[in-house]
Amino acid sequence: MKILCFFIVLLFVAVHGAVGFSRSPRYHMQCGYRGTFCTPGKCPHGNAYLGLCRPKYSCCRWL
């Protein structure tokens, strides 16, 4: 009976981990603070590119 409880807990942990793994990874950064802004496409000339803030939007920094 103890081993049955152990397997139920193990199954719960495995399913719980699989649910978290199925989500897509987050590659987007938070932008819009301390001199940064989010703009569609590429950053305007004279601004530094920092990364993506959402799909097809660039996170830029004022220079």
Curated annotation (Swiss-Prot):
SS bonds (residue pairs): C31-C59, C38-C53, C43-C60
Pro-piece positions: 20-25
Keywords assigned by UniProt, alphabetized: Antibiotic, Antimicrobial, Defensin, Disulfide bond, Secreted, Signal
One GO BP: cell chemotaxis
Location relative to the cell: Secreted; Cytoplasmic granule
Signal peptide, first to last residue: 1-19
A GO cellular-component term linked to this record: extracellular space
Tissue occurrence: Strong expression in the bone marrow and testis. Widely expressed. Weak expression in the ovarian stroma, but not expressed in the ovarian follicles.
Main location: secreted
GO MF term list: CCR6 chemokine receptor binding; chemoattractant activity
Family indicated by similarity: Belongs to the beta-defensin family.
Function of the protein: Has bactericidal activity. Potent activity against S.typhimurium and S.entiriditis.
Protein name, as recorded: Gallinacin-4
Gene name of the record: GAL4
